[in-house]
């Protein structure tokens, strides 16, 4: 796990933005209304609060900058040297020192003007002291413009640096430019480093991660190094030198066998000898890359002697090709194993191991006698082992069939199913049928139960249980069946009558309905009333006694009217109906009009008649005091 995370450094504002932010915050977070007729201690406190609040804002923001940026004396030497190469240690320390001085100056200015404000005897004098205090603070910050800009550039560059853990297991690639270092890291990790056929494509450190033996490894790709004195090396080359000097890693020195990088094998060997002091106490592997173009055996004797001398000194030489991936895994395995062994050896040499070993005691029992006591293996196990060696070949596994058949292989697990009827192996059984889970209705003993049922049925048939004649029904059973039929018919009739009564819609009261005499008589008869003497019934007598209704005589006019009223003129045809033939055509026109409006209503377009009152006085721009010299920013 990396101990440094430079991506969390807060943004460093420019001097102008710094001043604007702080003054705006003071205006927003402190009271803004004061009058000269207030008591003098209240006026002093009002302006003291503004000075102290501004000073505290500057102090907090500058302290945040100082605490976020790493201190070169406290971080790992690898990062300290890397920052010295990239940003110049003196310039970096000077910028942070100036920020620290500015913070102390702001604190002193606030302290002095708060002391002076205690003697202010009017609103005007207190206000002028406040103006002077805030002005001096802003001037101090304005003078730090270059330091703030430099620190912001450093912050941006630091946040883009790869996260390298100096203490974890690391493989470090180095060598001349364009020898295949970036191609190698792309093969062994998921890093996507740009690869081009020209030198110095990689201009900074790149990191990729991989797994080996269930451990996490980081692979660092360094920029190419040229063979010249240290003081002549540029910033790009010095990054590689810094990584070689400080990272405890297995070093992979990559050499180009084909010499397509523009440097011969002798030059690459001279660079190796030049930076060899950086390889002390580190596992080293020489990677002879681009063997797909030319191999060591195809080189001249003089060039072959270079690699033989390296092997004689104890450095393993492995031929690789990142194009065909030949030897890449071998290099990775060899480097990782050597680094693991080196780390264990280093820990064993340390004092911490001795402290632990002193607390450990290995108990070894004394030998009782010289009698041999080999492990006991039963004879059955030995015999079975012999049979396994001699007997017929093993049954082919599905994996063996897959390798044998290749693309024609199809995994079929149903062929191993043990069913009573082998033809049912490939029957399709649905999981869900008509909303029910089929597995819930499957009984393992279903066939056994079916056989028992079939035997029971055979016994019943043999006993003559199903031989009864259907025509042997007596008269009593016939009467029961006839009565049941009448009951069913009556039930259906009742249902129909109930449906008639439950008709929807307006109902006419019973008293308002016209009653037919014949219907009334039939209803009475059905209820059991004797209707033989119906002429003397009360409704017949009442009908004879009642008078016939006299019709009112139509009134006639005795005198003809003096004037005749003019009939009302015909109304003008409505516009939405005019020009249409009949009612059907009117309905069709309205339907078409609604369809045409649907799209416009759905989109909700703003029309010419839609009014909108704009906010003519936005509060965030017009709130607060607007005095002379302030209107350019409000």
Swiss-Prot record:
Residues 544-554, 586-604, 619-634 have a biased composition (Basic residues). It is found in: Nucleus, Nucleolus. One of its GO terms (biological process) is negative regulation of cell population proliferation. Ubiquitous. Pfam families: NOG1, NOG1_N, NOGCT. Keywords: Acetylation, GTP-binding, Isopeptide bond, Nucleotide-binding, Nucleus, Phosphoprotein, Ribosome biogenesis, Ubl conjugation. Involved in the biogenesis of the 60S ribosomal subunit. Acts as TP53 repressor, preventing TP53 stabilization and cell cycle arrest. Belongs to the TRAFAC class OBG-HflX-like GTPase superfamily. OBG GTPase family. NOG subfamily. Associates with pre-60S ribosomal particles. Interacts with MINAS-60 (product of an alternative open reading frame of RBM10). This is GTP-binding protein 4. It comes from Mus musculus. The gene is Gtpbp4.
